[in-house]
Amino acid sequence: MPLAVTLEGCRVRLEPLSLSHVAALVRAATQARDTFAFTMVPADHAAMTRYVQAALADQSTGWALPFAIYDLRSQAVVGSTRFLDLDYWSWPPAWPPGRTTPRPDAIPTVAEIGSTWLAPAVQRTGCNTESKLLMLGHAFDTWGVLRVTLKTDARNARSRRAIERIGGRFEGIRRAHARAVDGSVRDTAYYSIVAAEWPDARAALAARMSALPPLGRPATGWPGGTRAGLSTWTCRAAPRDRSRRSPGGCPTAPRLASGACPKSGSAPRPTSAETRSR
């Protein structure tokens, strides 16, 4: 089963999803909900609690690994994302006879990244791009997966453009595939990145991150955030990396153009004690 792990870049930290995130997720989900037309995003505390509980139940079976997205600029949880549809092509079989969960040492062979949503205030700020870079790096460079799937409602032009920007290759439309958020039957657009494509996709994502404007103060009035200490911003290193900070604030000396964080241009490293999924 995959390990629960924290992945940190220069703009976001992906934290293992837990019930302690519910209140912050509700705050993020109550902004301009018209942006969630194609995504199931609970709007109140009770529904968000059920949402997180369902994600954790999927994690307990080895099928998913969910995260809360923490924005390092606003110092607030701003959304959620996850690995899902994890499959294990191992021998001996990942699922021992009579068990419905994979062996503790089973590593995913293929994965999907999905169930992603972000508060409107941080959309198109690099949070999604860096989240994908961190997750793709973990999937390909840590797990060694062969393929990562990304999919969305075929009508969701914005999501499809975002997937294409991060290197997803269009595979086709699966017709009448699932029930949409509005209750209609949706067609689903499928994309993927395979292992052979990952080096080019990683370089393109790192270039996109380096082209983003420098981070400054968060927008006034961000729910749950704070402006304290954010007149200048440096990326946060893991405790074990603090002795290796470069002058610009990120661990390790090489920096990308425009002050981008080198952590986001390479395989992400776990930043907190890892615990096995339960």
PLM feature segments, named:
Residues 1-125, 138, 142, 178, ...:
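GNAT-family acyltransferases
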Residues 70, 80-82, 254-278:
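Vicinal oxygen chelate
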Residues 118, 150-160, 260:
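Conserved beta-strand-loop-alpha-helix junction that forms the acyl-donor binding cleft
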Residues 124-138, 161:
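Conserved acetyl-CoA-binding loop-helix of GNAT-fold acetyltransferases
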Residues 141-151:
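Conserved GNAT acetyl-CoA-binding A-motif
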Residues 151, 169-184, 257-260:
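Conserved catalytic-core motifs of GNAT/GCN5-like acyltransferases
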Residues 156-172, 265, 275-277:
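Conserved active-site alpha-helix within GNAT-family acetyltransferase domains
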Residues 235-252:
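Compositionally biased, low-complexity flexible segments
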